[in-house]
């Protein structure tokens, strides 16, 4: 089985498809273990973020697609148009580019590297990685570090978190006059909340499934921040001007009815809602309501493109470095795959040498001259070593040009 990757991202699939194929963080360890023990793959890493779901495997790409469809209980033909399947070399290049932020919605964004490390850690804990994927991701992390150190690809990038504040500022003139509600307390919400906190909003509230985690984030923010439970949302939603949500829930947390009731109490005051979750936390129908301004990760594209032109110059240098590293890695892997063949070839050569030497010793014992024995030995050794290649070439003829070219290369006859 060969190294391969199957996936979809923000470039190939809309949010409505991506959310159907996302893996919840809590379910991912079991999923990657299941995949690596299925008929589809022998090694597996699953990367699932708001912008991509990718399965890096040693396996059969068609069976991996089938597994993905079955896991999410979807018809295979519904998802196939949005998927890409990559061969060994394409998989290596793709992994390097993703880790370097070259394939991200935000060119050069650093968060993806941490997400890949989390995915690899989960696979390692489930013993779902073997020699091939371990080698791939060790090199991936090394290349990502080198690209980010030696190029300016990540400089001045507008992150999804900072873009959230920019978007709110397009609707409200002063963040300092606003009440801001964060739904969830994970990494994305922590990043977004940090940017909002720098603008000193009037009030910040973190709603989470557990109060302790919400309080922990409030303590980090160190401003007017207070915790609450998700169950409090229907009663408090109307008090907030800005709502940012990013949880791991597989079902919407905020429905159209809840927002309708909040808007009535707000008396035509606008409600800015940013849903950064995949699957979505806020029902899409909320966007149809007057005075509700609902944005999703796909709506952030234009905002995060700010400064992209300057970063694209750095990206060109990064792409060159990635290409060099891909070629280097592929050569190393092909060299390792050739080790058993090289050993077998040398064993055959040694076997031929011993046979010819044994015959030569017998000839010397019978009184043949050294000159005669050496002449016969050299002819026999030449015949033995070239018999198989010559026979194979005669059978192949001119039709198998790849074989003819390979033999010419091996014996340096193509000069």
From Swiss-Prot:
CDD domains: NAD_bind_Glutamyl_tRNA_reduct
Keyword vocabulary terms for this entry: NADP, Oxidoreductase, Porphyrin biosynthesis
Class of this enzyme: oxidoreductase
Record-listed NADP(+) binding positions: 184-189
Site feature location: Important for activity: 94
GO terms (BP aspect): protoporphyrinogen IX biosynthetic process from glutamate
Keyword NADP: yes
GO molecular function, one term: glutamyl-tRNA reductase activity
InterPro entries registered for this protein in UniProt: 4pyrrol_synth_GluRdtase, 4pyrrol_synth_GluRdtase_dimer, 4pyrrol_synth_GluRdtase_N, GluRdtase_CS, GluRdtase_dimer_dom_sf, GluRdtase_N_sf, NAD(P)-bd_dom_sf, Shikm_DH/Glu-tRNA_Rdtase
Active site: 50 (nucleophile)
Protein EC: 1.2.1.70
Reactions catalysed: (S)-4-amino-5-oxopentanoate + tRNA(Glu) + NADP(+) = L-glutamyl-tRNA(Glu) + NADPH + H(+)
The protein's annotated pathway: Porphyrin-containing compound metabolism; protoporphyrin-IX biosynthesis; 5-aminolevulinate from L-glutamyl-tRNA(Glu): step 1/2
Stretch forming the signal peptide: none
Further comment found in the protein's record: During catalysis, the active site Cys acts as a nucleophile attacking the alpha-carbonyl group of tRNA-bound glutamate with the formation of a thioester intermediate between enzyme and glutamate, and the concomitant release of tRNA(Glu). The thioester intermediate is finally reduced by direct hydride transfer from NADPH, to form the product GSA.
Free-text function comment from the UniProt entry: Catalyzes the NADPH-dependent reduction of glutamyl-tRNA(Glu) to glutamate 1-semialdehyde (GSA).
Free-text comment on this protein's domains from its UniProt entry: Possesses an unusual extended V-shaped dimeric structure with each monomer consisting of three distinct domains arranged along a curved 'spinal' alpha-helix. The N-terminal catalytic domain specifically recognizes the glutamate moiety of the substrate. The second domain is the NADPH-binding domain, and the third C-terminal domain is responsible for dimerization.
Stored NCBIfam families: hemA
Similarity comment text for this entry: Belongs to the glutamyl-tRNA reductase family.
Assembly, per entry: Homodimer.
Protein name per its UniProtKB record: Glutamyl-tRNA reductase
Source species: Neisseria gonorrhoeae (strain ATCC 700825 / FA 1090)
């Amino acid at each position: 089985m060969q190294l391969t990757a199957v996936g979809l991202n923000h470039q190939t699939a809309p949010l409505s498809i991506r959310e159907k194929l996302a893996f919840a963080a809590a379910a991912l360890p079991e999923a990657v273990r299941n995949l690596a023990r299925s008929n589809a793959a022998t090694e597996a890493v699953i990367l699932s973020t708001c912008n991509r779901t990718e399965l890096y495997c040693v396996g059969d790409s068609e069976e991996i697609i089938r597994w993905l469809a079955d896991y999410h209980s979807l018809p295979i033909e519904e998802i196939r148009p949005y998927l890409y399947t990559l061969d060994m070399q394409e998989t290596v290049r793709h992994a390097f580019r993703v880790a370097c932020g070259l394939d991200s919605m935000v060119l050069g964004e650093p968060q993806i590297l941490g997400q890949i490390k989390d995915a690899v850690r989960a696979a390692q804990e489930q013993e779902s990685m073997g020699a091939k994927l371990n080698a791939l991701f060790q090199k991936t992390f090394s290349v990502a570090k080198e690209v980010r150190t030696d190029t300016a690809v990540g400089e001045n990038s507008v992150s999804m978190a900072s873009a959230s504040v920019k978007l709110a500022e397009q609707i409200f003139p002063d963040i300092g006059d606003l009440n801001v509600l964060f739904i969830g307390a994970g990494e994305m919400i922590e990043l977004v909340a940090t940017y909002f906190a720098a603008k000193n909003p009037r009030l910040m509230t973190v709603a989470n499934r557990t109060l302790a985690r919400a309080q922990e984030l409030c303590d980090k923010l160190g401003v007017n921040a207070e915790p609450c439970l998700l169950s409090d949302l229907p009663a408090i939603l109307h008090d907030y001007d800005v709502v940012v949500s990013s949880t791991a829930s597989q079902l919407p947390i905020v429905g159209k009815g809840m927002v309708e009731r909040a808007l009535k109490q707000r008396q035509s005051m606008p409600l800015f809602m940013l849903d950064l979750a995949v699957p979505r936390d806020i029902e899409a129908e909320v966007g149809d309501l007057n005075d509700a301004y609902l944005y999703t990760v796909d709506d952030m594209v234009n905002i995060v493109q700010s400064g992209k032109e300057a970063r694209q110059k750095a990206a060109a240098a990064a792409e060159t470095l990635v290409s060099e590293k891909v070629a280097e890695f592929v050569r190393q892997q092909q060299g390792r795959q050739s080790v058993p063949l090289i050993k077998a070839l040398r064993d055959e050569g040694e076997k031929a040498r011993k046979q010819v030497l044994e015959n030569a010793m017998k000839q010397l014992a019978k009184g043949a001259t050294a000159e005669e024995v050496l002449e016969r030995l050299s002819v026999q050794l030449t015949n033995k070593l070239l018999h198989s290649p010559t026979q194979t070439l005669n059978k192949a003829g001119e039709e198998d040009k790849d074989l003819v070219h390979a033999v010419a290369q091996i014996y340096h006859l193509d000069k």
